Amino acid sequence: MQNKIIIHGARAHNLKNIDVEIPRDKLVVVTGLSGSGKSSLAFDTIYAEGQRRYVESLSAYARQFLGNMEKPDVDSIDGLSPAISIDQKTTSKNPRSTVGTVTEINDYLRLLYARVGTPYCINGHGAITASSAEQIVEQVLALPERTRMQILAPIVRRKKGQHKTIFEKIQKDGYVRVRVDGDIFDVTEVPELSKSKMHNIEVVIDRLVNKDGIRSRLFDSVEAALRLGDGYLMIDTMDGNELLFSEHYSCPVCGFTVPELEPRLFSFNAPFGSCPTCDGLGIKLEVDLDLVVPDPSKSLKEGALAPWNPISSNYYPTMLEQAMASFGVDMDTPFEALTEEERDLVLYGSGDREFHFHYVNDFGGERNIDIPFEGVVTNVNRRYHETNSDYTRNVMRGYMNELTCATCHGYRLNDQALCVHVGGEEGPHIGQISELSIADHLQLLEELELTENESTIAKPIVKEIHDRLTFLNNVGLNYLTLSRAAGTLSGGESQRIRLATQIGSNLSGVLYILDEPSIGLHQRDNDRLIESLKKMRDLGNTLIVVEHDEDTMMQADWLIDVGPGAGEFGGEIIASGTPKQVAKNKKSITGQYLSGKKFIPVPLERRSGNGRFIEIKGAAQNNLQSLDVRFPLGKFIAVTGVSGSGKSTLVNSILKKAVAQKLNRNADKPGKYHSISGIEHIERLIDIDQSPIGRTPRSNPATYTGVFDDIRDLFARTNEAKIRGYKKGRFSFNVKGGRCEACSGDGIIKIEMHFLPDVYVPCEVCHGRRYNSETLEVHYKEKNIAEVLDMTVDDALVFFSAIPKIARKIQTIKDVGLGYVTLGQPATTLSGGEAQRMKLASELHKRSTGKSLYILDEPTTGLHTDDIARLLKVLERFVDDGNTVLVIEHNLDVIKSADHIIDLGPEGGVGGGQIVATGTPEEVAQVKESYTGHYLKVKLQQ
């Protein structure tokens, strides 16, 4: 078999007809600047062709469901294996998708509980077991010899009434004795029962002494008792002991019933097992009292009830005033000072009690009626669910929040599933086991107490679960829980989960293509990830990893550097060889960083800030352990810590949302904290994340940064435009007039293929240029508007150098390292890192107030060390203007450049949530307990 993948003439995107050889069964890292063509080579050429060939080998019938895959622009590829891509863009946003379902661990857990689980009565009556007549007979015969007993069939359990017809039927069926409320009577001599009291009635089927030769009689009596007692029977051993048996999974005491244990009972995605209240989501949209009464110190007259604000309408305030007068509630008392009964009345209504309501609207319409008072919470709920108006529904939605389901307590399953425990009544139910971190889950599996029979059944199931948990542990995800929603995972986390699933499959001879698996991973966990990658390689697989992490590069078997620049300045193979060979290559920027010839210098001094702080006290969301944190303003701050230590919770869930709530009146509720101070020192909050800058191809760098408005102004001022009477709007592809109407200014036509993927083809009228021919006849410096949109940022900067207003905005895009993108490049084609830098560019040309807080979550994602150097210069410009920049980051080059570090830990999950170290990088490097400090110390010494 060929030991190389040989590629000839690859031309996808910016690749310049390249030839490259990649060794098989090795760990190969593809690196290079952002936009240099790494992904074009790895994903759009190698993976696309591997996938296409696999699909081509399937039948025509199967292919119609998979769609026809386009052949990548390449002359030939030899030595390809079936390819599996593990990227970061395919995270499921479905609320039913969890870590447990993605890794298939849930499937094995469901099987485990169905096979060795024991149901327990939810009312505390002990284990619920189902026994056949044969099993009951065996248990009775196991009682001590000469035990006197009577077999009873329970027919009435805790029911009121005289039950005369039941006694008549018992007599008719030929039975002689009954036990009523614990006393034995002849069926003809039962005293009259009280109608208003609850009674228990059992029929005496037989009286026996346990001795040889009674099996046959006992069996007949047991069957008769089960038949008469609807599957239940009691054995009264005359010495005061009673044994309860059932041939159903049903509690003999209270009748709580469990269906037959099967895997679907433990699935929250099946109606059979899901919680009936939340339909298996674990959360329910409920009215949030904190949003309904945002300021409890206000009285009802002062507008304590936000949904009934008199500004929008006086209907509900009038109703409130008249109802409170009728029920004797003082409208001038602060809401928090009302009695509990009064608050319940205001919130949930008066029930059946009515008041007289009189109201005249602005048009003279009158309402004069006696009605119950609805209550504000009930009112918001009703209007949300009953309205046909999207506007009203959105307004009501603003007073609601997704709260933990009160029925299943967030476990997603019904009572019948949650009453089943493994390892005895003290053992966990499936909901509790899913709430454990991966590390704790592993420990629990090792300590599980099972009977010999249960161990035999559970052994192969537990092995599968254990293996999958171990793989997750090995890729640095030990802090995650199986119940964690897949939509809340970062790109790096979801990729490593799928990586763990692939390791678990133990396939060999496969070509795996990974996109920056080290994202979101602390340096401490990186070694474990690299070991996992090597393990996959050692199974006989080829791994092609697009990566910027130096450790991964140095441990690779083969390194390919794509460059030298980005966009049209990239697309060539600059270096290919072992890491040591690439490090010696003078043309390779990557090689220069690996050899230490190029590096990001440590700042000569740290900024002292402006002396002000934002201080959070008692941060206790998720795993945060009631932290008190100070964020010094006017500095470059890095929040660090191992994966799962609580960085995102502190910054994104608490700080960002609390500031947004105060500054922007954002309805999004922050996580749990006691108090926050210092927000008055901030005027603007700018969250610069990696979400797309636009959801449609109509959004592009020119429109996003606002430079397109200036360019359209310029074209409208040309002589040709003035002669034709064209205004600025003529040069927009979003409105009628100048755009091509055949494609509505998209430049492409979408052809719906029904069960195949939609196909996009260039518009035949405008040939992809978006405008009609008349608009394209207007030129500025011999270029029309479509040609300007096709220019790269670098070219546009030269082209518009004489127009300072335009050049200044374009310069900011170049400053963030995006000189290679075209002005009209669709936003949907930009990577997360490129979108984030585009947002930075749009901030750069705004006038700085010096009171802005910029928050960035892992801004180095997708960035080469050379790009990081550029990014740091941009961030430092913000700080030098007096603003505060706060980053969540693992990259040591960024961390060492910060003025102030807040290091969380020491571990992830329950072992984290504490502040391990704070201060300058030099101070944190001296803290022995800090993992970040340990790696930072080495970096600072370099």
From Swiss-Prot:
The UvrABC repair system catalyzes the recognition and processing of DNA lesions. UvrA is an ATPase and a DNA-binding protein. A damage recognition complex composed of 2 UvrA and 2 UvrB subunits scans DNA for abnormalities. When the presence of a lesion has been verified by UvrB, the UvrA molecules dissociate. This is UvrABC system protein A. It comes from Streptococcus pyogenes serotype M6 (strain ATCC BAA-946 / MGAS10394). Coiled coil: none annotated. Forms a heterotetramer with UvrB during the search for lesions. GO terms for cellular component: cytoplasm; excinuclease repair complex. Disulfide bonds: none annotated. Pfam families: UvrA_DNA-bind, UvrA_inter. ATP binds at residues 32-39, 641-648. Transmembrane segments: none annotated.
